[in-house]
Amino acid sequence: MNFTNDEIMNEIKENMNKKTYTPDFIPDGYKVKPNSYGAALYQIIPSRKDGEPDKERFITTTIPEINTRYENIENGEVSYNMHFFDNRTPVNLNVTAEEITDSKQLLKLVNRKLDVTSNTSSKLIDYINQSKRYSPPINIKVATRLGHVKDYFIYPYKDQMENSNVKLHNNDRGFQKLINSFKSKGTLSDYSEKVFVKIKDLPMVMVMLYASLGSVLLYEFDIMPFIVELAGSTSTGKTFTLNLVASVWGTTDLTTTWSSTRNSIEAMASFLNSFPMFKDDTRNISPNFIANAVYNYSSGESKSRSNKNLTIDEKKEWKNIMLSTGEASITNMAEDKAGVSARVVTLEEQPYPDNYDFISLDHEFRENYGTLGIEFFKQYQSKKDKYKDCLLYTSPSPRD
């Protein structure tokens, strides 16, 4: 009998909500006894003498159950969901395969409420893997990045992924804030009538909005990452515009500052993958940093790095658009102006007319967001072959 991912996830949630402190399956050779914390797990040591009772060796008060196996469609790596009760409170941990097969790695989970010591870790490892073999966890295919992954397009929106055979799986708290910022409110009609109508005649704003939407098409047309920036000495409207064009995908929390490390920019670009990145205010960034960041980002791949196993980490790739703001243009800030300018589209004209009504527009895009981007990409997907043929037909030949 086949089950959908939704049916599987609902069953997992129902099991997690049950008021029981004992897993459904306990392997032979183990025993669970109730205590003031809920329950405790013991290993049964058979007696060697007739008539002598078996011994019970304590293992843990947080009896783990491995109920879900996550299979990464991109690299084949697996991880697991570990469920247990800590002082009668349910706990769910995303754990790596290494953490539940190596006693030293398992010990690190003590900081995440697992009751384990150096004396019990190896026994708990044995128990976990016996349980997993005799009661295999449900397998779910997952992606750990957004956008184009293998033959799938991974949305950050829960309702868009409900019927997908692949689920988004994230273990990073920093990225979780980004995921939570991808959400929608209102309707496409509301966005059109209350937001789009107010900006459709503003060229600089519309270029930024088109870049925000167009980011998800770079993979489709095999275009390398690039940056679109709104620059100018005036303080009017740059950050406002960045928040505005982020609203096609979600809330203003999608906007982050340039005050971050190159590694964090690279990690965010890799995670967003196809979706745009919004970076505000280059003012406090050094010319050397901005040049290196532009080159690293526009290369579309992470740097090669060695790991603790003395091997090379797998490179991550991305194809998206970064939208940026700053008083000085990135091109003028960088020492290598020619090299950087080939990777940056700079908009320096005033984005809004004098006495523009920012207050009402700010209210509208904070109340209506996250609808245009979804519908834009759905429309493209519905007729992608026609759109690609049209682009090939209208593109100039190499001789032109």
Q: Residue spans of the language-model regions?
A:
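Conserved glycine-centered beta->alpha loop in an early N-terminal alpha/beta scaffold
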Residues: F3-K198
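Conserved P-loop NTPase catalytic core
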Residues: M333-D385
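Structural recognition of the conserved hydrophobic beta-strand(s) that form the central parallel beta-sheet
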Residues: N320-E327
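AAA+/P-loop NTPase substrate/partner-engagement loops
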Residues: L244-F278, T282-I285
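Conserved Walker
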Residues: E301-K316, I330-D336
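Conserved small/polar residues in nucleotide/adenosyl-binding loops
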Residues: Y393-D400
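Conserved catalytic/switch belt of AAA+ P-loop NTPases
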Residues: N292-S304
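P-loop NTPase catalytic core of nucleic-acid-dependent motor ATPases
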Residues: N165-T252
